From Swiss-Prot:
Its main location: membrane. The gene is uppP. This is Undecaprenyl-diphosphatase. It comes from Corynebacterium efficiens (strain DSM 44549 / YS-314 / AJ 12310 / JCM 11189 / NBRC 100395). InterPro entries: UppP. It is an enzyme of class 3 (hydrolase).
Amino acid sequence: MNEQTYLLASAVEPVAAENMSWTQTLVLSVVQGLTEFLPISSSGHLRIISELFWGADAGASFTAVVQLGTEAAVLVYFAREIWQILTGWFAGVFNKDRRGRDYKMGWMIIVATIPVVVLGVLGKDLIRDALRNMWITATVLVLFSFVFILAEKVGKKDRGYDELNMRDALVMGFAQCLALIPGVSRSGGTISAGLFMGLNREVAAKFSFLLAIPAVLGSGLYSLPDAFDPSTGQAASGLQLTIGTLVAFLVGYASIAWLMKFVANHSFSWFAAYRIPAGLLVMLLLWLGYLNP
């Protein structure tokens, strides 16, 4: 092989992804569990912390797979409600006389999931590459905080769980698409939409978590093969992904329990008070060169 041929082969040969360390895996899994359900953006925090302490992006595939642990926490925490919705939906499908509240709730979740599935599949490359820019993450952390504040001030917050309808579900479903941008927060986008629609905080949070189940489980399973040998980001072993998912589950369950109690008596504006200085700090670190975009 002459020199020109060698250089050409080297240029087109894919570069092997850097392997993640166990420390990085465990830390990021804890961060995932803590931030997935809080409206502060889990993907944004994973991106920031991974870049700040390890100088590399863990990648969207790792994030999607470890999210399976936090969604398992939702399945366990809301097991009774999920079982009621599933049985009610299947019963209604085969028997028109049994089409009650749970049957309708099942359809609301299904229909509201469609927008993020379509956008997620069509925009896969954009999500994994262009949008994972630290400047975008930091800017969105700051700007979207004002959406929380506005939702708290504008929303009446007087509608209960039984008052949820298909319009609410669709609005929250489209809001879930914003979560594809690191820095927005899946729960932040959907809960804010619920508040704008007049839902009370507990109902908005509960439906937000239920709505995330199909999309996150689908994304995690879809990204599972790529997590071992990603085109972007870092590679993790099967054992690392398994332990990371378990850690995210345990921490995520505790996070859900805390948030459901917190929202009963506290405004979501408290999270804006964290997001704004956090985003500004990341901008400063980027400007000083301590973080890579």
